[in-house]
Amino acid sequence: MQTKLQLTLLPQQVGNETTFRSIIKQKIGCGEDDFSYRILRKSIDARSRQPRMNVSVEVFVGENPTTPYENEFHYRDVTTATPVVVVGSGPAGLFAALRLIELGYKPVVLERGKEVSDRKRDIALQNRNQAFNRESNYCFGEGGAGTFSDGKLYTRSKKRGNIRRVLEIFHRHGAQDAILYEAHPHIGTDRLPVVVRNMRKTIVDCGGEYIFNAKVVDLILENDTIKGVKTADGNTFFGAAVVLATGHSARDIYALLQQKKIVVEAKGFAMGVRVEHPQALIDRIQYHCKWRGEYLPAASYSIVNQIDGRGVYSFCMCPGGHIVPASTESGAIVVNGMSAAARNSHFANSGIVVEIRPEDLTDYHQFGALCGLEFQKQLEQTAFNNNGGGLQTAPAQRLTDFVTGKLSNSLPECSYLPGVVSSPMHFWLPEIIGSRLRKGFRSFDRYMHGFLSSEAVVVGVESRSSSPVRIPRNADTCEHIQIKGLFPCGEGSGYAGGITSSAMDGELIAEKVAEKLNRH
């Protein structure tokens, strides 16, 4: 017998397995423990003084549970199949490659960085302020920027594709069960390396190719049709199509496209800072209690407001996380956030960013479609020039001092491993960002009383939340509007944002590639 239950319980009732089973047993009227269950959905309702958990459960009495998967996957042998070049191994590239295999095409994945184990060593040196590798860092390398992040899988992009399918692929490759039922699923930076390594194994086992240290430096074009790519080591890779999934930080790709007179466009994006609070403070604000206890997860938040005609909002909020260095160039400071699966650090951080439109950048119009990219680069260099001279040290300021416009005499404890130095960020941040941030922080404190705290620190700069460039594609075929066979994909194309939407875009592009090749 199978039955479904919708339960609203206290966190301790859900978190204690014996208590939870007892409640299920009572609900189904089963006199024995001869049942198993699977959680279908779990969310937290923290609107009242006593947070509750809403749990949807499927119960199996006297029979084995059915599979948790709603989708079927058929990875076939594509060793001798038609090759398709996939540039980049982030979520968009990986999911494009896996879908191509299902559709009968051989992906040739070219990754400019290193495999994930070597990448971890380079990142460790970067965290210790000892070395910086332009091709192996928090943005570049196996799995892309998402590998060393919180691994958040929540997305509002429900029309882009099959979200459940993406979650199941991650789960099949080693992600935890909870991503299939949590309202806001995440994998965690400690588990993501295993997942992306398993995805690589699937690709290679099926006959696909996966090549590291393969930085694309040129495109092979004939009569406005792409035939392949050249890499920095002099190798050439040909394919029936090229999927360009290079991520939002591959500035050299944008420059290459512009150099070859391939159309790119300026688009709106966002930049700002990363704000860090003690996790206990965010817990008190969000859960309305002094201590969240052992059964509630580290509290998160999502806030947004319109300030002077532009959005100011939280981005990539990492409860129980750390701030990390995310620059891809020397002489520049970029920060981002990440969390382990347990989200068990003492800090809560989030990007707080300001919407920027191309028309806001009147001083950069000489850079054409790359005006936002140039603005982004200059702000990252300004942050480096105000970081006290360290390799990856970041400028910082107490949140209250930032809002009132004074230099901080001291800084709160901060999770950023390379270290922070007090800097008058209110002074050197561009007015279109700094002014809106100050007003935004004051408004956020009205929604989350206590957010504007002297215990909070602002760290700069959060500049890679989205791409300032779009590589335009045909609305029907998803090919580039000018170059046949070139399929821009993922965050770097300007058509996705975040792991899940990038993964869905990767699958979409693989299907569009197959449609094109099946017609010829």
Locate the predicted segments by residue:
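Residues forming the flavin
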Residues: 2-51, 57-148, 152-520
